[in-house]
Protein backbone atom coordinates (compact mmCIF):
# COMPACT_ATOMS: atom_id res chain seq x y z
CA UNK A 1 0.00 0.00 0.00
CA UNK A 2 1.40 3.37 -0.97
CA UNK A 3 1.34 6.29 1.46
CA UNK A 4 -0.73 9.31 0.38
CA UNK A 5 1.42 11.79 2.29
CA UNK A 6 5.19 11.95 2.03
CA UNK A 7 6.17 12.79 5.61
CA UNK A 8 9.81 13.18 4.64
CA UNK A 9 9.35 15.25 1.49
CA UNK A 10 7.42 18.11 3.05
CA UNK A 11 8.53 20.10 6.14
CA UNK A 12 4.93 20.62 7.30
CA UNK A 13 4.18 16.91 6.94
CA UNK A 14 7.24 16.19 9.07
CA UNK A 15 5.83 18.39 11.83
CA UNK A 16 2.50 16.57 11.62
CA UNK A 17 4.30 13.23 11.90
CA UNK A 18 6.18 14.46 14.98
CA UNK A 19 2.89 15.31 16.71
CA UNK A 20 1.31 12.01 15.68
CA UNK A 21 4.29 10.14 17.10
CA UNK A 22 4.06 12.13 20.35
CA UNK A 23 0.38 11.25 20.69
CA UNK A 24 1.13 7.59 19.97
CA UNK A 25 3.80 7.57 22.70
CA UNK A 26 1.35 8.96 25.26
CA UNK A 27 -1.14 6.24 24.35
CA UNK A 28 1.53 3.51 24.35
CA UNK A 29 2.66 4.57 27.83
CA UNK A 30 -0.91 4.59 29.17
CA UNK A 31 -2.76 1.84 31.00
CA UNK A 32 -4.95 1.20 27.94
CA UNK A 33 -4.43 -2.47 26.98
CA UNK A 34 -2.31 -2.98 23.86
CA UNK A 35 -5.14 -4.84 22.11
CA UNK A 36 -7.48 -1.89 22.66
CA UNK A 37 -4.82 0.53 21.45
CA UNK A 38 -4.56 -1.38 18.18
CA UNK A 39 -8.35 -1.50 17.73
CA UNK A 40 -8.46 2.28 18.21
CA UNK A 41 -5.65 2.83 15.69
CA UNK A 42 -7.36 0.59 13.14
CA UNK A 43 -10.72 2.34 13.52
CA UNK A 44 -9.27 5.84 13.30
CA UNK A 45 -7.31 4.80 10.20
CA UNK A 46 -10.50 3.43 8.63
CA UNK A 47 -12.38 6.66 9.38
CA UNK A 48 -9.53 8.74 7.95
CA UNK A 49 -9.50 6.60 4.81
CA UNK A 50 -5.81 5.79 5.14
CA UNK A 51 -5.18 2.40 3.57
CA UNK A 52 -1.49 2.47 4.50
CA UNK A 53 -2.30 3.07 8.19
CA UNK A 54 -5.16 0.54 8.26
CA UNK A 55 -2.86 -2.10 6.77
CA UNK A 56 -0.01 -1.27 9.17
CA UNK A 57 -2.17 -1.30 12.31
CA UNK A 58 -4.00 -4.47 11.26
CA UNK A 59 -0.64 -6.21 10.84
CA UNK A 60 0.49 -4.88 14.24
CA UNK A 61 -2.72 -6.16 15.85
CA UNK A 62 -2.32 -9.58 14.21
CA UNK A 63 1.27 -9.76 15.43
CA UNK A 64 0.04 -8.89 18.94
CA UNK A 65 -2.39 -11.84 18.83
CA UNK A 66 -5.64 -10.20 17.73
CA UNK A 67 -8.06 -12.60 16.03
CA UNK A 68 -9.07 -12.31 12.40
CA UNK A 69 -12.76 -12.28 13.34
CA UNK A 70 -12.36 -9.23 15.56
CA UNK A 71 -10.20 -7.45 12.97
CA UNK A 72 -12.87 -8.10 10.35
CA UNK A 73 -15.51 -6.52 12.60
CA UNK A 74 -13.75 -3.30 13.67
CA UNK A 75 -15.60 -1.21 11.07
CA UNK A 76 -18.92 -2.64 12.33
CA UNK A 77 -18.04 -2.58 16.03
CA UNK A 78 -21.44 -1.22 17.11
CA UNK A 79 -23.24 -4.29 15.75
CA UNK A 80 -20.53 -6.81 16.61
CA UNK A 81 -20.73 -8.79 19.85
CA UNK A 82 -17.02 -9.67 20.07
CA UNK A 83 -15.84 -6.47 21.78
CA UNK A 84 -15.83 -5.84 25.53
CA UNK A 85 -17.62 -2.89 27.09
CA UNK A 86 -14.26 -1.18 27.63
CA UNK A 87 -13.26 -1.72 23.98
CA UNK A 88 -16.63 -0.42 22.83
CA UNK A 89 -16.17 2.71 24.96
CA UNK A 90 -12.71 3.26 23.45
CA UNK A 91 -14.08 2.75 19.94
CA UNK A 92 -16.94 5.20 20.60
CA UNK A 93 -14.47 7.82 21.81
CA UNK A 94 -12.34 7.14 18.73
CA UNK A 95 -15.37 7.48 16.49
CA UNK A 96 -16.35 10.83 17.96
CA UNK A 97 -12.82 12.18 18.32
CA UNK A 98 -11.78 11.24 14.81
CA UNK A 99 -14.96 12.64 13.30
CA UNK A 100 -14.48 16.06 14.90
CA UNK A 101 -14.69 17.79 11.51
CA UNK A 102 -18.02 16.07 10.80
CA UNK A 103 -19.78 17.26 13.95
CA UNK A 104 -19.72 20.77 15.35
CA UNK A 105 -20.14 19.45 18.89
CA UNK A 106 -17.00 17.32 18.93
CA UNK A 107 -16.78 14.56 21.53
CA UNK A 108 -19.87 14.37 23.76
CA UNK A 109 -19.56 14.54 27.54
CA UNK A 110 -21.13 11.08 27.71
CA UNK A 111 -18.46 9.51 25.47
CA UNK A 112 -15.71 11.32 27.31
Regions from the language model: what does each represent?
Residues 1-112:
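Hydrophobic alpha-helical segments
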Amino acid sequence: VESRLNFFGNPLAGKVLKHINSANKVIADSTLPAATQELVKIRSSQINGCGFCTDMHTKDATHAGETQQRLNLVAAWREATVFTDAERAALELTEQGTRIADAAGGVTDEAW
